[in-house]
Design a protein with these regions (language model features):
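Non-catalytic terminal accessory segments
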Residues: 1-121
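Soluble catalytic domains of enzymes that build or remodel membrane lipids, polysaccharides, and related
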Residues: 134-325
Length: 326
């Protein structure tokens, strides 16, 4: 839990710093002077009020975390805009009459956040064809991860995605973690599991845990535990694999790993060598491992295919580069 307190403290500190910067940035803007805020004190008061009003409006309209994300986008782009326009002004030899840097930052923030919202609420099917010398024959797999039920779409939206999966006519459906989220309600979890139970496949549906499925907070807050989730999944014919493997049709293995977050919770999980050491290496092995951070060991253990989630499409620069270090 210590890491989460550290993250919370950093988030609060960065948010406060961002609000102070934005308040000062608004106070210094030529636009503020045009509103009749001539004195320094009145400008600062206006800047602080505008920054707090903007942040509060975002928090009430979206939620607190999304308000923080929007604030940081605006702050970073304001800093970048001020830097670029300072260079231009240096060569221009005279100040700008309008706050072009601020306007550019707002427009770019709006464009970036709108694009993010659109991508977050629209799901695309990506097709991959994988060839292997092993005798597995044709196998049609549907994989999904990070549905985080209730976060970007509700159970009705999830049911629509299930229908799209069914139209792919899969031999098997694999879920690589974060099926539910810390904010998912018990009823949403139950309805989503029922939707999974409607899938018609040759070999069934298999699930491996992600870092959010068991929840980071008090189970009472969302109304169910990790064990409750397992019960509902099994009730709907979903096979849950936790450091376990199963041989299917004497052709291929599905190996589901415990998530890396189990280690952070003080719980053990098997190494890749331990998971694969007793398997027939002539048969194709498919690993479900939510967090893609163990590729070297998976290669050494001679895993054939590793399927993961967690990165949500790579996230944003530069955080995507930082994540590659861990």
């Amino acid at each position: 839990m210590l890491i989460w307190y550290i993250i919370l403290a950093i988030t609060i500190a960065v948010t406060c710093a961002g609000l102070l910067f934005l308040a000062n940035r608004i106070a210094r803007s030529p636009f503020t002077a045009k509103l009749g805020q001539e004195t320094s004190k009145r400008r600062k008061i206006f800047g602080a009020a505008a920054a707090v009003f903007l942040f509060t409006a975002l928090a009430l309209t979206l939620n607190l975390m999304n308000a923080v994300i929007c604030l940081l986008h605006i702050v970073v782009l304001c800093l970048a805009g001020d830097f670029v326009f300072a260079i231009i002004q240096h060569f221009r030899k005279q100040p700008f009459r309008h706050d072009y840097a601020g306007m550019a930052a707002l427009l770019l923030s709006l464009a970036a956040l709108s694009t993010g919202w659109y991508l977050d609420h629209h799901v695309w099917t990506t097709n991959y064809t994988i060839e292997t010398p092993k005798k597995i024959k044709d196998l049609r797999i549907v994989l999904f991860a990070d549905s985080h039920i209730g976060t970007t779409f509700d159970t009705r939206g999830f049911a629509e995605h299930i229908s799209e999966m069914q139209r792919q006519n899969p031999d098997i459906v694999l879920i690589a973690g974060d099926f539910v989220d810390d904010g998912t309600t018990r009823q949403q979890m139950i309805e989503a599991c029922r939707a999974l139970g409607s899938l018609q496949t040759t070999y069934g549906v298999y699930f491996a845990f992600g870092n959010h499925d068991k929840g980071y907070h008090d189970p009472a807050a969302r109304g169910f535990t990790g064990d409750d989730l397992i019960t509902e999944l099994k009730k709907n014919n979903v096979k849950v694999l936790q450091d376990e493997n199963t041989l299917i049709d004497n052709r291929f293995y599905i190996i589901g790993r415990k998530d890396f977050s189990e280690i952070l919770r003080g719980n053990p999980r098997q190494s890749m060598n331990e998971l694969l050491q007793n398997l027939n290496k002539e048969k194709f092995s498919i690993i479900l491992d939510h967090q893609p951070n163990d590729y070297n060991n998976q290669t050494d253990a001679e895993a054939d295919l590793v399927l993961s989630g967690h990165t949500h499409g790579g996230q944003l620069f530069p955080l995507n580069k930082v994540c590659l270090l861990y």
